[in-house]
Amino acid sequence: LPFALQDKIGVAKNHAIGRNRYIGYLISLATRSYDGMRVGLDCSNGSTFNIAKNVFDALGAKTFVVGNEPDGTNINMGCGSTHIENLQKLVKEKNLDCGFAFDGDADRCIAVDENGMEVHGDYILYVCGKYLKECGKLQNNTVVATVMSNMGLFKAMKRENIDICVTTVGDKRSEEHTSELQSLFAIS
């Protein structure tokens, strides 16, 4: 990369205080300890490289991480949620319980099970929706899904008497409907 011109050089700031507050906030959202769990993380050399491990470790998990060496040019390059093969290999080789691959800005996460197999978002939405309903915490008895969601999700939610708000694909639309319905989560 070419060097920046002297008059165009920005200012580097240490955001450790904000990062640590954010880590504390994420930890506060957890409803249980992860003691004894072995978790793989692929941080895509992106924004979670110095956050995700801290969160899982603080919750008691033993974490193993790949994609946590950003150099400013390697975000999402052969790693993260668009290349889960690194995480799958890590989970299988280390005999982990599960794994999570984030994209560079951490607005997407792909999960894998103990065999390194991808756990699809529709299944995660079903499990979370059902759990929240059982706990009495599913706002408006509704989850938000996209038009790309599998018909099996709709049938399973109907069986659980959970409503689905269907939106077009994209974070913006999912977020709009989630806010409008005061829903806790969505899949986009």
Task: Locate predicted features.
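Self-splicing inteins and homing endonuclease
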Residues: 98-99, 104-115, 179
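Proline/glycine-rich low-complexity loops and linkers
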Residues: 2-23, 28, 115-175, 179
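Glycine-rich phosphate-binding loop signature in dinucleotide/nucleotide-binding domains
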Residues: 91-96, 137-138
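Buried hydrophobic positions in well-ordered alpha/beta secondary-structure cores of metabolic enzymes
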Residues: 26, 42, 84-88, 100, ...
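Gly/Ser/Thr-rich loops at beta-strand to alpha-helix junctions
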Residues: 44-50, 106-107, 149-151
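Short acidic, glycine/serine/threonine-rich loops at helix termini
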Residues: 50-54, 76-79, 109-115, 123, ...
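Single conserved hydrophobic/aromatic residue that forms the stacking wall/gate
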Residues: 176-188
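Gly/Ser/Thr-enriched, mixed-charge loops and adjacent short helices
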Residues: 1-92
